Regions:
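Serine/threonine-rich, low-complexity intrinsically disordered segments
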Residues: 16-17, 55, 66
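Surface-exposed loop/turn positions
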Residues: 30, 69, 82-84, 98
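Short proline/glycine- and polar residue-rich coil/turn motifs
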Residues: 64-70
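Noncatalytic modules at the cell exterior or secretory-pathway interfaces
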Residues: 77-96
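Short, surface-exposed beta-strand/strand-loop-strand elements in extracellular ectodomains
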Residues: 43-63
Length: 113
């Protein structure tokens, strides 16, 4: 079995309040080590909230996003194992947009013959 490490970036932009939307979902032979979840509120007047869950457990719960600002949601690496789902929910007025940026390491186990 070979192990392949890939350093990746994933970005998502939303302009509406949404609930339990999948962000990242590693396959069963993958493990994601998330280094950064950076969220940007592009509104000059609205302060929506965001929650992040990892397999139904809150990583961040109802984080208020300041106007025209970015915030780092995690301070330590976060492990997302294969077969689980990292999701987000937004609430409030999100019409100007909220960007979610994730930097992570994908550890992929490949079977070689």
């Amino acid at each position: 079995m070979a192990v392949v490490n890939q350093y990746l970036f994933y970005g998502k932009s939303t302009t509406s309040a949404e609930s339990n939307v999948a962000l990242l979902s590693p396959a069963v032979n993958e493990t994601f080590i998330i280094k950064s979840i950076r969220v940007t509120n592009k509104s000059g007047s609205n302060t929506p909230t965001i929650s992040i869950t990892n397999n139904a457990f809150f990583v961040t719960h109802t984080q208020t996003l300041a106007t025209n600002a970015s915030v780092e949601l995690i301070s330590l690496p976060l492990v997302v194992v294969g077969g689980t789902v990292l999701k987000y929910s937004t609430a409030g007025t999100v019409t100007n947009g909220v960007d979610i940026a994730i930097s992570y390491l994908n550890i992929k186990k490949e079977v070689t013959t």
